[in-house]
Structure formats: C-alpha cells, structure tokens
C-alpha cells in the first residue's frame, strides 16, 4: 500500500487518504468527528499515526497542517445575515420538497404541478423542467456527491431518474402500487431506494434500470428511508410505528426497532453508522444502536407530534421539530436536551443543521423559516416573506445559502 | 399542516374519517364554504392557488375537506386529489349565469372520471344571498342533473357567506357517508 495524497473534508471534519493497493487506487477516511478549535493538535496527530499505518513520519507535518486547517474552519466566526436573493415563481402549484447538489451550485424543487425543476443557484435561472409524471412530484434527490443524476418519486406510483445535464429521463421505475413518498440514492450512486404508501420499499439498479429487491415487512405506509454512510444498510420508517433495518446487499430484514407508540415521522443514521434516531407522532424521539437494533434512549419533552429529526453532520447533536411549534437540540452522547428553540407560531415540519453544525434551520406552517444558534437555542434570524406554509428547506454545503419551498407555489433563495 | 400531515390524510381512512373533495370553478366560493364549515373568519379570502385542507367534526365523523383551486389553468390538476375520495362536493356560483355552461361541462367531466365513479355528489347552489342568484331547481335542470344515475346526488341551495343551507348539505353528506362506509 502506498499513500498517494491527502485530501481535506470539512464537513464532517476528516482527512481522506488516497492510496494504491494491488495496482488499484482506493480511498479511506480518517474521521475527526470530535475535533474542536482547541483540540491539542500534536496529541491528535500522534494518535492518528498510531491508528493509521499509511501515515508515516514523513507526512506528519502535512497532517498537522491539514488538522489546523480543519480547526480554522470550525473556529470561523459566522455572523452571516441572510437576506432574500430571489423568489422563483414558475411552479403553478404548491412545492413539496427541495434539495441541493453537493457543491450547492444547483438545486431541485418538486411540486403538485407534477414537475421537478432544476435551478442554477447563483442566478436563480430555471435550467430544466423535468416533465412526465402524471401526479404530484413529492420526493426528490440528487445522487450526491456526484450530482449528475436526479431522482423523482411521484404520487403516480412511479419513480424517474434524470440526467442533470440534459434533463432527459434515463429510467422510469414501475412496480409500486401506491404513492412514492421517499427516496434516496446509495452513497456509491449504484442504487436507488424508494419508499411507498404501498408499505414496501424497493431497491433499483441504476445501471441496469431494474428492481433488485423489494423490502417487504412493514404493515403500513413507509414515509422515510435513509442509507447509512457506507451504503450497506438502509432503514425504513413506517406508519406501523416501527423502523426496519435492512441489509442492502441481500435485501434481508436485520432488525425491527419496536418501541414507538405512534406513526414514525422520520429516521436517520449518524455519520459513523453507530446510531439511528427516530421521530414519532407519539411526541418522542428515540435513539437506537444501529448494529444490534436495541433501544438506547427516549428523548422526551415535546408536547405534540415530532415531525422531523436529524443528526448534525458529525453525529454529535440531534435536532427535533414538533407540531407543538418548538424545536429541540439534544446531545447525542449525553442524551440531554441542550436547547429549546421557541418562537414559531405554528407547527414546525422540517429541521436541519448547517453542515458545520453550529446553526439550525426550521421551516414552519407560520410561513416563516428561522435560524437558530445550535448551542444556545437563540433565534438568529426570521426569514419572512412566504405567503403560505413552508414545507421544506435546505442549506447548501458551505452553509451560506438557504432555499425554502412553500405552499404558496414559490421557492425562495436566501443568501 | 406540513407535508407529513398531508400524507397522513392521503392514506385510506379508518371508518370514522371521511375524505371530501371540494371542487368547482374559480370564484364559486369553495374556500369561503370551507372556512364557514370550520367556523373561521371569511372576510379575507383570496383565490386559491393550490389547495386548503381542513378537518371538521360532524355527527360522529371527522370530515377531512380538501378545497382545490378552481382557476382554469390548474383544473387539469384536480385529478391529483381524486384518490380515496368518499364524497364530492361541487360548488356553483348561482349568480354567474354566464358560466353555467362551463361549470356544467366541468361537472360532467368529473362524473366521467373512473376514480370518482360511484362517489356520491352534493352540488351546492351557492351565493343565494345575491338577488340575481338562480334557484337550485333551475340549475338542476340546466345541468341535467336528473340524468345522473350511477350514484346518489343532491342539490342544495346555500350561502357560504351567511352559512344558510350549508348545514343541510352537510347533513346529507353524513347520511350518505354512513350508508357507504357501513
């Protein structure tokens, strides 16, 4: 094995090793999820050297430099105030979901008008309107980090895969017998997973354009799914109150996470694939061991349904959004609630961290999106202007651009 | 309401929940009717660009009412909402005689939709508070409602503004839901 080069990954903090083994170029990462601006660099570099045989004495200086750059990034003060950049009004019916590509140069919006539109972030120009679905386009995704493909899942029971460049449809996947409401590419971008109101999830081979597995086991609608970082596991969240963990290679059910007393609203892995977080209509959020499927903790506190949950990129914190109009931040390690985000005047349907993890974005039925300090829970900014409920929101990777999708048929870009 | 709540209302509903689709031309008074049903303020209503959903309790039922915008350019999207419909309510502006033909045509097309086949239909002859409003009997005749034989139907005159006649219509809805659901 010979190390070829070292690459930086800002979010979550890490160093990517590019090396040659048996004539083949490979990569692996050193995750530095606990890195802080004040971490002792010398001690950390020593530890990395002990842990990683590819890191020899000759590259220690380089590693030290990279760690310092990551620390600088984490320590950067962000006083960025967002303001409205553009209102995009070419959808003629309410929007559903929105998503950025990895670099944030482009984003997509799904709509009740049966289209998905591709936009240039810098200009706000519409690049393509992806047309062909016969009903609401609900679930949308880029195959990040590549971003050359877009998947759309529709109430018409089909899923389509499109070329980002040309806007042409590569595949239409048929097989579900009810609305498709969630989907995701695997991290390698070889598979697409779709979840449906027909109670099944399916895995589709993107090259062959065919179904490779049907994940049968839930007794009610599947409304959330998520791959882990390595792509060998997928979880599905269902209205049957459970979350299922599946082996991607075989399509076999590995665990069923039983404990919630209401419909699941959201489910996600943390970055290192050790934990699963789930949100439910039973007003709680639960943490599970991703390997054994055992229940670790119940994060209670909300007085109404938990509508969305997420980890930050490093997996250190969890944010929950609730119909009670508040959001909460929990420490994933101690399971303690660190902050309550109070101020919205109606239910919060979406919550996400910025990639750096210091800031939280919430979207609400009160027609506003709000930005919060993830550590203190202080409201940093209220993004006002939408004329109706905000259904979806997203940060770009750099954390300096936000998009919001609303029932008022518009999408707004905030800089 | 949020996207997730919409998904919850999308699934085929348990016995005591009823999915009602509220359609009609633009300016027929669908949103006013919806707000009247939910006992909400009706003084500031603007054309619906998408849809509104409200749940109201009536006679032991939870009525999930979907009010869909009626402007011409978004009428082709009405079919987005047909799935699992228990009752169709079609609203007509009884004072807008110029558009009786247009509204009759839209209704006829709805009644031909496979996904709405057999679904009971209530026609509200709305805006009876206006002096120029045509009576329900005249509208029924103009729209050839008596030729509807594949489902139960009813025409009810009402004023969404004052609320008059609205409850009578909803009573018919509950009566016909109960026969269908049980």
UniProtKB/Swiss-Prot annotation, chain B:
One GO term describing the cellular component: nucleoplasm
PANTHER family xrefs: ADP-RIBOSYLATION FACTOR-LIKE PROTEIN 2-RELATED
Subcellular location: Golgi apparatus membrane; Cytoplasm, Cytoskeleton, Spindle; Nucleus; Cytoplasm, Cytoskeleton, Microtubule organizing center, Centrosome
Lipidated residue numbers (N-myristoyl glycine): 2
Chief site of localization: Golgi
InterPro entries: ARL2/3, P-loop_NTPase, Small_GTP-bd, Small_GTPase_ARF/SAR
One Pfam family per UniProt: Arf
Classification via SUPFAM superfamilies: P-loop containing nucleoside triphosphate hydrolases
Lineage summary: Eukaryota, Metazoa, Chordata, Craniata, Vertebrata
A Gene Ontology molecular function term of the record: magnesium ion binding
Keywords per UniProt: Cell cycle, Cell division, Cell projection, Cytoplasm, Cytoskeleton, Golgi apparatus, GTP-binding, Lipoprotein, Membrane, Myristate, Nucleotide-binding, Nucleus, Protein transport, Transport
GO terms classed as biological process: cilium assembly; Golgi to plasma membrane transport; intraciliary transport; kidney development; mitotic cytokinesis; photoreceptor cell development; protein localization to ciliary membrane; protein transport
Annotated family: Belongs to the small GTPase superfamily. Arf family.
The encoding gene: ARL3
Function summary: Small GTP-binding protein which cycles between an inactive GDP-bound and an active GTP-bound form, and the rate of cycling is regulated by guanine nucleotide exchange factors (GEF) and GTPase-activating proteins (GAP). Required for normal cytokinesis and cilia signaling. Required for targeting proteins to the ciliary membrane by releasing myristoylated protein from unc119 cargo adapters into the cilium.
Membrane topology per record: Peripheral membrane protein
Name of the protein in question: ADP-ribosylation factor-like protein 3
Amino acids binding GTP: 24-31, 67-71, 126-129
